[in-house]
Structure formats: structure tokens, C-alpha cells
Amino acid sequence: MTPIRHLTILGSTGSIGESTLDVVARHPDRFQAVALTADKNVEKMFEQCKRFYPSYAVMLNAQSAEQLEAKLRVAGLGTMVLSGIESLEKVASLPEIDTVMAAIVGAAGIRPTLSAAQAGKHILLANKETLVMAGRIFMDTIRQYHATLLPIDSEHNAIFQSLPQHYNGDLISSGVRRILLTASGGPFHKADLQTLSTVTPEQACAHPNWVMGRKISVDSATMMNKGLEVIEAHWLFNVEPEKIQVVVHPQSVIHSMVEYIDGSVLAQLGNPDMRTPIAHALGYPERIESGVQSMDIFKIAQLNFEAPDFERFPCLRLAYEALSKGGNMPAVLNAANEVAVEVFLAGKIPFTVIPAIIEHVMESIDRQEITDLEDVLAADLRARETARKWLDTQAWQRGQSGAPLFRAEQWNG
């Protein structure tokens, strides 16, 4: 009989968190959700508590935690409600927990994910920023505390499945020539530059293949998402940037490929549904039911591949540059992007200004070595401040009076 895995799901109300709970619900004999966490979505967390009866529910926002606690009390549920970043770290490292789904979006996910690593947990990593901002620190922590790590991003999970089973982090000794990292290209991969300048947040969030949150949908539209995944792949698989080839594949059927020195190319295919990599990681090394519809290969009929256009999507170029420079630059890239996407989603800037903000911030901050988490967070903070100050001075965001439409201090992302 397979022992029950006890889970903490960091970011349970997001799209990855909900998909994880969908898979968990299909296997009540294998998984138990002990702790669920969210930022401030009280209603969704309340519904999850009613269905899964977790021992702990953590809301990052203190006011939301109070609201949730009141609702649970009325409902007669005994879930303990906690709040704040320290509580996220606590439930990620509980002694009774063996598996942590790290699905918090953004830099807020770094500290609890590191806590899980320091506690030697089995980590299912969906939070990009942990590797993008603190890749060396995180991977060193995984090794130091003998934690285990499985990637949840569909592309990295596909690479993991396509590499040799006992891959040791060395492409040459494993007979691997390069990694082929696929990208859908997002909703605008054929759009001209003039069209891109008029893109609305609603259009950017309408991904043709995947169901995702708003922030990652915009990242997909700018191809920053793929740039961040290049950085992730570097740390996950110990692959240099020049050995990672991005391939635009609009159908999102092939999730990534590994090319070997004998000419073989191994690929992982499947319907674009995040429950597939989630189920793979939850059940590993076994295979478990995910609820994903069987792929109709005859209906697909045709698969297309294109080289990425760095002029149309400069965010991808900027990500490669940040990885090549190393040090604090990936953290700077990520923070500037988070600010830029936030103001774009608020309708404050055009779509094409997103890479301009990021490039300005990267040019304004000198490269520095990263030695600990404090260095990472300092780089993150400085990049955000630099982005906000630049935003506050730009002519395109001024009203008829000439005053800025918003001031930098309004944005605390």
C-alpha cells in the first residue's frame, strides 16, 4: 500500500494550486492537504477549507486572515488560520509535511520555498522566481539539506522526463547535445510591432492554449515567461545558455525536447493541461490518473516550429542577457518585469513599454555578486524602486495638467 503524502500547497487559490487540488481530490487514498495558503482570496480559500479540511490555512494578508477565521468559525470548521510571511515559512517546514507544492506567483514565494528546502522536503516547484532570482542559493540549499526537487512547469517537467533517468547534471557525460525549450509564442506571435502597441490587458490575458493567471498570461504574451524558463532550465539541469534553444511551437502539444549526440530527439507530448505535470510530480516515480483528456493525435494533424523573433519579443533577449551576466541581474530582470506587468494590467502603460522598463532598469543597476538571500531581496527592492521612479517621469503617463497619472509610491508590488 502506498503511504499517504501530506501536502502543503503554497498558493492554493491560484491556477496551479487549484489544479493540484483537483488531482489530489482524485486520490484521497494517496494525498492529504494539511496546509493551504493564499494571499487574500478569502472566498476561494473558504471553499477549499470546506472541501479538504486542512489543518492550517494561511493568508498572507492579515485582514483576509481575520475574515477567513470568522467564516470558518461560523461554519464550525477547525482549521487554524495564520497570516504573514513567517506563517508561510512555518507551514512549508512542518514536521508532519513531506511534500510542498510551491505555487505562489512572484517573489513572495521565495522565502517559504527556501524554508521547505531547509527542512529537507519533497518540493514540487512551480514558482519561477525562486530559481530566477536565487537559483544558486536555492540549488545549494537543496543539496545541503538533501531535499528533493521536481519541476512543475510543463516545459521543465517535459525536459525532466526526456533526460536520462539518472541525469547527473552533466550534458556531455549524459550524451545530451542541447535542450529544446518550446514556447507557444502567446497570442501575438504573428502580430506586427504596430499592433503590439495597441494590445489591451484583456487581449494579453487571452492565451490561445493554456488557462493561466493574469500575470503569467502577460509574461507569455511578451515571451518573458519563456525567458524566465530559460533561466530556470539553467539552474535545474546545469545547462549553459547557449545549450538552451527556444523553439516557438504554437500548438503547445510538444512541451519540450532533449537532443542527444547520436541524433535522437526525445520529446514529451500531451494536451495543454497543467494537471499532467502536476500528476507526474505528485505520483513520481509512479504514474497516476490526472483527469486530463486523452490526446487525439489525429485531430492535431500538424505541428509547427519557428525560431523566436527577438525584435518582436525583446523580453526574451533581455532574459538571456540577464542569465549571461549572472549575479544580481536575473533578480533585477524579474523585479522590473513584475512592476511593468502590474502597471500594464492596471491600464497605465502600453504593452510595448514593458520591455522598455525592464531594459532601463537593467542598464541603470550595476552587476553585483549574490551571496545570500538578503542580497537577492536587496536587488529586488532596488530594481522595483528604479522602475517606479522611471515610470513616474514618463510623458506618456501624464494627464492634460501635466501631472503624472500616478506616483511611484502608489506601487508597492
Curated annotation (Swiss-Prot):
Naturally occurring in which organism (per UniProt): Nitrosomonas eutropha (strain DSM 101675 / C91 / Nm57)
Listed EC numbers: 1.1.1.267
SUPFAM superfamilies reported for this sequence: 1-deoxy-D-xylulose-5-phosphate reductoisomerase, C-terminal domain, Glyceraldehyde-3-phosphate dehydrogenase-like, C-terminal domain, NAD(P)-binding Rossmann-fold domains
GO biological-process terms attached to the record: isopentenyl diphosphate biosynthetic process, methylerythritol 4-phosphate pathway involved in terpenoid biosynthetic process
Pathway: Isoprenoid biosynthesis; isopentenyl diphosphate biosynthesis via DXP pathway; isopentenyl diphosphate from 1-deoxy-D-xylulose 5-phosphate: step 1/6
Residues annotated as binding Mn(2+): 153, 155, 229
HAMAP family found in the cross-reference section: DXP_reductoisom
Keywords: Isoprene biosynthesis, Manganese, Metal-binding, NADP, Oxidoreductase
A GO MF term: 1-deoxy-D-xylulose-5-phosphate reductoisomerase activity
UniProt similarity note: Belongs to the DXR family.
Residues annotated for NADPH binding in this entry: 13-16, 40-41, 127, 129, 213
Protein known as: 1-deoxy-D-xylulose 5-phosphate reductoisomerase
Pfam families: DXP_redisom_C, DXP_reductoisom, DXPR_C
General function of this protein: Catalyzes the NADPH-dependent rearrangement and reduction of 1-deoxy-D-xylulose-5-phosphate (DXP) to 2-C-methyl-D-erythritol 4-phosphate (MEP).
InterPro entries documented for this protein: DXP_reductoisomerase, DXP_reductoisomerase_C, DXP_reductoisomerase_N, DXPR_C, DXPR_C_sf, NAD(P)-bd_dom_sf
